Curated annotation (Swiss-Prot):
It comes from Homo sapiens (Human). Pfam families: ATP-synt_A. This is ATP synthase F(0) complex subunit a. It is found in: Mitochondrion inner membrane. Belongs to the ATPase A chain family. SUPFAM superfamilies: F1F0 ATP synthase subunit A (SSF81336). It is a multi-pass membrane protein. It is linked to Neuropathy, ataxia, and retinitis pigmentosa: A syndrome characterized by variable combination of developmental delay, psychomotor retardation, hearing loss, optic atrophy and retinitis pigmentosa, dementia, seizures, ataxia, proximal neurogenic muscle weakness, and sensory neuropathy. Leber hereditary optic neuropathy: A maternally inherited form of Leber hereditary optic neuropathy, a mitochondrial disease resulting in bilateral painless loss of central vision due to selective degeneration of the retinal ganglion cells and their axons. The disorder shows incomplete penetrance and male predominance. Cardiac conduction defects and neurological defects have also been described in some LHON patients. LHON results from primary mitochondrial DNA mutations affecting the respiratory chain complexes.
Amino acid sequence: MNENLFASFIAPTILGLPAAVLIILFPPLLIPTSKYLINNRLITTQQWLIKLTSKQMMTMHNTKGRTWSLMLVSLIIFIATTNLLGLLPHSFTPTTQLSMNLAMAIPLWAGTVIMGFRSKIKNALAHFLPQGTPTPLIPMLVIIETISLLIQPMALAVRLTANITAGHLLMHLIGSATLAMSTINLPSTLIIFTILILLTILEIAVALIQAYVFTLLVSLYLHDNT
């Protein structure tokens, strides 16, 4: 049972080669561009969502921070598309892998921190010691603030991994219960199947919300350092 339960989180291989690279490259192919296609409802909706997301993310930033607009919009589209594709049956979700989420979180976090130290080093150092701190607490507070800064990318990655993994496990368990009850009690099967449908709708919302939260936190880190 445990092996079957966690089998969907094992990175698949094709001819002995990891298929994760192909899976990661697949989501951008689902986003059409108006350069080659005539504008239709899909492209219009896509452009509207991109503009809305860009406006929400970039309102708080100055001119230097807005140079990240393309990266942040690309990030939220990539994570959202990857999460949604992972909800398909017999598919693999790369965002359930902590290693991949760390590979996204660490460079983005490091980029914002480096930008802060390069452009506003005094303000960046001031975050480690808030104004008015009592003298005896200064050494400990500097250590605490340093640790809180260093765990930011880990918090980003763990939050995304935990939420997506928990949803997939719950869907797997309820789906297995639906199949098991189908030969025992039909009314109970219908009730469990209804719960599964509602949970699937909830997981679609979670997939989109987690993409937004991940990108929003990166945007906030950028705002603090520009």
